Amino acid sequence: MNRFSAKEYNYKILFSSNNNIDIYPYLVDSTGDKSIYSIGPLHGRSFIVSCKGDRYIVSKGNGLSYTQYDFLFTGELSSLGDDTLGLLLLEDATRDFLVGQDVAKLGVKINRMECVIELDKKLFLPNGHILNPILLQYSVECPYRICDAPFMDQQLLCLEIEKWERYNTKNYRKKHLIAADVMINNLRVMHDNNILHNAIHEQNYTWALELLDFELGRTPNHPYKKSDYERHVPSLYHRELFQTYVIINYIAWVLNEEISYKEIDNLFAEYGFNIQKYKLKENYYGKN
């Protein structure tokens, strides 16, 4: 875990889950007198800003945890684009917060959204735009994501895995099957409610099996603003099966557990997902 200096700013609240939260309006700044922490190289713009009881408070959009610069402008999509590494855009923060709340209401375990705030500071982008930094603040049971396994203390990893027994209603002996059951059930719940996460991978699940990062997602309450994006939604559900499959495989490898792909396919089938229907046909006439 690496410490970074940060500076505190005045702010206004754009969204809040409740009034009883502490807010951490910090940006990375080598001259600042606040401390924030990055727990690994894959958490580019997310930092631990505090701990409350058994939960970690995370802030997203506070600047970069790599390079000597706090923000790096890329201007993707067009010359007028505002995409900037280290920065969280208002539209993305809003969607992350609101879609996440929709998913949580269905019983899927996610990060607990706390607030979206706008800082009283101006950032001057090379395209001529002036933005105020936006921060998304949330809490998690475990700050380490599945992809962080190479950087975790093994004792801490084992402690997180032991907690999975609370979900082991089917008495699995292999730990990756417990995780698989949780994740596939999450898919079933989301897809049955016309929810697309659209970014399921090992960086967006924690070792407490919390699903994160909903800024690319959509729900019936918060559909995509562009009709062309909405039109493609039905075709995107399928790939989430295989994105989840990759995470399950990753976990099995990390835990050095032998994985049976037939067993995983059968587990998908239990939840109504037929992996076999995606296999290629052996000849032109469709005979398998």
Residue ranges of predicted features:
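Activation segment of protein kinase catalytic domains, centered on the conserved DFG
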Residues: 168-178
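Conserved hydrophobic core/spine positions of the Hanks-type protein kinase catalytic domain
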Residues: 99, 185-186
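Short, glycine/acidic-rich beta->alpha junctions
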Residues: 91-95, 182, 197-199
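Conserved ATP-binding subdomain of kinase catalytic cores across diverse folds
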Residues: 24-163, 192
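Catalytic activation segment of kinase domains across protein kinase-like and atypical kinase folds
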Residues: 121-138, 195-249
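Regulatory N- and C-terminal appendages and interdomain linkers associated
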Residues: 1-40, 65, 80, 174, ...
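Protein kinase catalytic-loop region centered on the HRD/HxD motif
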Residues: 188-195
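Intrinsically disordered, low-complexity linkers and terminal regions
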Residues: 164-167, 219
